[in-house]
Amino acid sequence: MAAQPLRHRSRCATPPRGDFCGGTERAIDQASFTTSMEWDTQVVKGSSPLGPAGLGAEEPAAGPQLPSWLQPERCAVFQCAQCHAVLADSVHLAWDLSRSLGAVVFSRVTNNVVLEAPFLVGIEGSLKGSTYNLLFCGSCGIPVGFHLYSTHAALAALRGHFCLSSDKMVCYLLKTKAIVNASEMDIQNVPLSEKIAELKEKIVLTHNRLKSLMKILSEVTPDQSKPEN
């Protein structure tokens, strides 16, 4: 009997929150948990640690200050067309190559995307000469895309990214609450300058969050440098 190829969960960088692979360790201290809830509440209410609320101002901001990549009109969830398992979201969308490659490219995917271990080599089409892994829906098992390992210069930028077939997904739009086929959705590619600005803002948000957690940790942890009597 032929051995079945092993499959393993897709690998990706640690996300800030949600069910994306990696995840962060939960803080066991109650004060840390409370601060986390307060920060999440700020985001939901339209403020952020970068805005007046994060600087300790008494008056809230006049208008919503959600980061540009979290604006409702730009947020969408990509689901398996067959079982509706969540595969990815617009926050981690890199490129829309539906017309040229028939795929939407993501920098991260959820744990519902399973990467098949054996490498395949393309012998025809756009993946000719490329080495890649197939991606499957972990819920219903249908193939949903591929993950490039090595390829020619034209697709070199896609290495390490997750290419999900647009005809195997549906898209849930958060602003309108509508569900449309991913292949029919007009995804606007964000200019590079805007992506860089978003990345800088994410770095600052993460830095402020780490500073807050370090302050809490220093308050609840006894000073280990003092010698014991």
From Swiss-Prot:
Taxonomic lineage is: Eukaryota, Metazoa, Chordata, Craniata, Vertebrata
Q: Which GO terms describe its cellular component?
A: Cajal body; chromatin; chromocenter; chromosome, centromeric region; intracellular membrane-bounded organelle; nuclear speck; nucleoplasm; nucleus
UniProt-recorded name of the protein = Protein Mis18-beta
What is the organism field in this record? Answer: Homo sapiens (Human)
Q: What's this protein's family per the entry?
A: Belongs to the mis18 family.
- Binding sites annotated in the UniProt record for Zn(2+): C80, C83, C137, C140
Q: Which gene encodes it?
A: OIP5
InterPro entries for this protein: Mis18, Yippee/Mis18/Cereblon
Which GO terms label this protein's molecular function in UniProt?
identical protein binding; metal ion binding
Q: Does the keyword Heme apply?
A: no
